């Protein structure tokens, strides 16, 4: 894992005679081919990516986790509302960062540019090992659970069946994403519309219930009746469970370079999508408690299916199908965006360089998509979905906070750089206070879960110094990596994107500064600066 520009050029240097050959293999060897990621994501598709990634499985799974930890219906609803508001605050911070640093890769790119290569690599490392494979595995398992649950009305579906169907879902959507960016965005648009219709049905049924007088658990004296002893650590875990349901609000930042007019469409999509999702989530949870008691909700393995069975009668089959389609679209959106994160990391030299390549005709990052799919399939061996959600929530909030803190650092160190959007510093401060609350009490309540997440993240430190920072690797190792890259290129028919078309061109100064943070007490000379011509 060497620096991106050197990886892109070494093949062409070794095979200069292939420059005039136009075959896919020759294009792969030359590292060019004139292909680039296309700007095909407009405002509607951008909103579809945000909404589609947020509304995956969380609203259909996490209500159980939120209620269980909150201890009462009223407090659970407050958790949903506050989490939505904090998500909107975080999205405002990311909107400013997204137009200030207009690069794909999202918070990875922001952390790397502000705090340096090691910090950025740790964000990428934990994303590769835990966050995004876990997120996709949870959504895929939820998809299979909602598909199979009607076939097993008196018991839970078998674990082997759940995992097999989840794997089939992942493989199918990986093929779609590898085939065409347009296909992937169309699938996302269609399934986002479908999941909004499913949630609209839930909300409408809830309104009908309220009109009938079925709002026992919404009355204040009943809503705040605790069914367990209040515990501030468990309340923090309730916020983590809720944050999983809002997870994906920052995914559009991963595909900034494929956005049409990102300076306008990135903030517009955020401003439209986050309030919409918050509204839908709060009223969907209100609808749930009009038909189910807290005990019934906690006993259900598929909350939306139980809700449909109680209110739809013979038409109850609509709900599991709607939820399955919703989570299917969630897997598609997560594959689409997380593969761009790995693509961006490889382009910076933080992952194997083959992951920074795209297909010569389809212009899709096939190696990054295959890598994403494989890592998610490996994650499917983990059985406890709610433990996975806790891992994702804690580690995500850790890096969300670091990224938002970077916004303050960037304001201080680079006050004069262009900022098409400039929000009040009160917003990042509010977000960081909430972030600190979650982390402190999560560590107190679940030290083992949080400690495992931190330990996995710290394993990236030696990997960074051996794989990225160490430039003088043995020649046999470099030759092996280059041979493996060439074989992968020919198998996938992929090349490096043409520089300049996506706004990612690098200068010598960019390369020299690659591992240097904007915020550093004293300048440190990059080892590669001596190798620059």
UniProtKB/Swiss-Prot annotation:
Associates with SLC3A2 to form a functional heterodimeric complex that translocates small and large neutral amino acids with broad specificity and a stoichiometry of 1:1. Functions as amino acid antiporter mediating the influx of extracellular essential amino acids mainly in exchange with the efflux of highly concentrated intracellular amino acids. Has relatively symmetrical selectivities but strongly asymmetrical substrate affinities at both the intracellular and extracellular sides of the transporter. Residues 1-33, 500-533 are annotated as: Disordered. It comes from Rattus norvegicus. The record marks 135, 247 as: Important for substrate specificity. The gene is Slc7a8. InterPro entries: AA/rel_permease1, AminoAcid_Transporter, L_AA_transporter. This is Large neutral amino acids transporter small subunit 2. It is a multi-pass membrane protein. Expression is seen in jejunum mucosa and the epithelial cells of the jejunum, ileum and colon, as well as in kidney, placenta, brain, testis and skeletal muscle. Expressed in retina, inner blood-retinal barrier of retina, retinal vascular endothelial cells. Also expressed in the intestinal epithelial cell line IEC-6 and in the retinal capillary endothelial cell line TR-iBRB2. L-tryptophan binds at residues 135, 396.
């Amino acid at each position: 894992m060497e620096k991106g520009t050197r990886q892109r050029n070494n093949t062409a240097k070794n095979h200069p005679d292939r420059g005039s050959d136009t075959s896919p293999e020759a294009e792969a060897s030359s590292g060019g081919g004139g292909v680039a990621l296309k700007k095909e994501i407009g405002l509607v598709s951008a909103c579809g990516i945000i909404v589609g990634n947020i509304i995956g499985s969380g609203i259909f799974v996490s209500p159980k986790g939120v209620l269980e930890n909150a201890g009462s219906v009223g407090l659970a609803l407050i958790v949903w509302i506050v989490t939505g508001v904090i998500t909107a605050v975080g999205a405002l911070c990311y909107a400013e960062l997204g137009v200030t640093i207009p690069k794909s890769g999202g918070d990875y790119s922001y952390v790397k540019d502000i705090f340096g290569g090691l910090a950025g690599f740790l964000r990428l490392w934990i994303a590769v090992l835990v966050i995004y494979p876990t997120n996709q595995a949870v959504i895929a398992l939820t998809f299979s659970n909602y598909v199979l649950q009607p076939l097993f009305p008196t018991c839970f579906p078998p674990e082997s069946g759940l995992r097999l169907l989840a794997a089939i879902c992942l493989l199918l959507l990986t093929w779609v994403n590898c085939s065409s960016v347009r296909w992937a965005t169309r699938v996302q648009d269609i399934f986002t519309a479908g999941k909004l219709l499913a949630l609209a049905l839930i909300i409408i049924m809830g309104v009908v219930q309220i009109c009938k007088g079925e709002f026992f658990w919404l009355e204040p004296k009943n809503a705040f009746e605790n069914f367990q002893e209040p515990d501030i650590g468990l309340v923090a875990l309730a916020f983590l469970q809720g944050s999983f349901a809002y997870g994906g609000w920052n995914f559009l930042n991963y595909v900034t370079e494929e956005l049409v007019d990102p300076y306008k469409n990135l903030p517009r999509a955020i401003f439209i999508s986050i309030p919409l999702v918050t509204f839908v989530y709060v009223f969907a949870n209100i609808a749930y408690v009009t038909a189910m008691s807290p005990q019934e909700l906690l006993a259900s393995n598929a909350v939306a299916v139980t809700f449909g069975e109680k209110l739809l009668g013979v038409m109850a089959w609509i709900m599991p199908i709607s939820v399955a389609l919703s989570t299917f679209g969630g897997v598609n959106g997560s594959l689409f965006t997380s593969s761009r994160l790995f693509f961006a990391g490889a382009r910076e030299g933080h992952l194997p360089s083959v992951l920074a390549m795209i297909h010569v005709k389809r212009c899709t990052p096939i190696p990054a998509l295959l890598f994403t799919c494989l890592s998610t399939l490996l994650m499917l061996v983990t059985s406890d979905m709610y433990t996975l959600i806790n891992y994702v929530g804690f580690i995500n909030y850790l890096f969300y906070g670091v990224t938002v803190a970077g916004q303050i650092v960037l304001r201080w160190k680079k006050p004069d750089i262009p900022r098409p959007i400039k929000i009040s510093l009160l917003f990042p401060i509010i977000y960081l206070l909430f972030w600190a609350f979650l982390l402190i009490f999560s560590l107190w309540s679940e030290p083992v879960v949080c400690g495992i997440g931190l330990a996995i993240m710290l394993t990236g430190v030696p990997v960074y110094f051996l794989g990225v920072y160490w430039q003088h690797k043995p020649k046999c190792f470099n030759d092996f990596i280059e041979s493996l890259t060439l074989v992968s290129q020919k198998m996938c028919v992929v090349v490096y994107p043409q520089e300049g078309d996506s706004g990612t061109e690098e200068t010598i100064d960019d390369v020299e500064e690659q591992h240097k943070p904007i915020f550093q007490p004293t300048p440190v000379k990059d080892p590669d600066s001596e190798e620059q011509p």
